Amino acid sequence: MDEKDRPKNLREEEEKPSEETKILISSLPWEIDYLGNKLFNYEGYWYSEDILQSIPNIHTGFQPQETDIILASFYKSGTTWLKALTFALVQRSKHSLEDHQHPLLHHNPHEIVPNLELDLYLKSSKPDLTKFLSSSSSSPRLFSTHMSLDPLQVPLKENLCKIVYVCRNVKDVMVSVWYFRQSKKITRAEDYSLEAIFESFCNGVTLHGPFWDHALSYWRGSLEDPKHFLFMRYEDLKAEPRTQVKRLAEFLDCPFTKEEEDSGSVDKILELCSLSNLRSVEINKTRTSSRVDFKSYFRKGQVGDWKSYMTPEMVDKIDMIIEEKLKGSGLKF
């Protein structure tokens, strides 16, 4: 990726919130989350004020193309890994997996794949999308989102594209959120606890939550339209990475050829995108963005890490809630 292609200053065309947006926000019920921030309930989900400003911008300005790929996830669910894997897959004809100048060796995955509601449409309905697009017109546009499927239905109604959702066990998500918040420059660890995060998740009052409704929106999408929706589990990616990466490639219409498989391309992608390799990239060790150290995106990535932190009472409570919320859906964690 050339320097000019880096996704800098994606919020150049800043627009103030419309009066309609201000009126909407003032009319919504709100709660205080575990960080003391005000979250507003809009059509069943909890959003911060800035995300609420981005939703109408996405509705009016985002025009999906059939070749677009949207990577969706609840935060701290494997987003960074999915971005790296997807970029390496769809760009492997342009960027050799053995190239020392591969973009993933010089840029954080979040720089390469911008977030719709935060990087692009937060302050504008007409962001400059050329800031991150590949110079190859045949390459798909890659976007990410932490929103549920529901607010995306408006732009997707006109032109549906490929959507990949990665879901992670909510107990591991909570622990990961806890540690990630400690890395934020504006957050003091003593200001909140795992117990506070746990209660917010149980009550459903978390940014983009409730967690189960978020996951179910994409789960149902994958059942109704498997051509356009792929539902992936973080735990499956960890347990069977080769199988899952090949599944992802098939879904994205860029399957591995026999020659690629014989030459070890699958393993090369997994190595390039591995937690240990990405963690060792210089920019991921030293760069800070939005008051977050890039290194904080690469902690453990373990499955079942929650067992070291949650009490039996916490586990019983969240398991009962999960069983109730997912009952009859076919979705299991």
From Swiss-Prot:
Its EC number is 2.8.2.-. The active site is at 146 (proton acceptor). Disulfide bonds: none annotated. One of its GO terms (molecular function) is brassinosteroid sulfotransferase activity. Gene3D superfamilies: P-loop containing nucleotide triphosphate hydrolases. It is found in: Cytoplasm. Keywords: Cytoplasm, Transferase. Induction: Down-regulated by trans-zeatin. GO terms for cellular component: cytoplasm. It holds the Pfam family Sulfotransfer_1. It comes from the Eukaryota. Sulfotransferase that utilizes 3'-phospho-5'-adenylyl sulfate (PAPS) as sulfonate donor to specifically catalyze the sulfate conjugation of brassinosteroids, including castasterone (CS), brassinolide (BL), related 24-epimers, and the naturally occurring (22R, 23R)-28-homobrassinosteroids. No activity on phenolic acids, desulfo-glucosinolates, flavonoids, steroids, gibberellic acids, cytokinins, phenylpropanoids, hydroxyjasmonates and coumarins. This is Cytosolic sulfotransferase 10. It comes from Arabidopsis thaliana (Mouse-ear cress). The gene is SOT10.
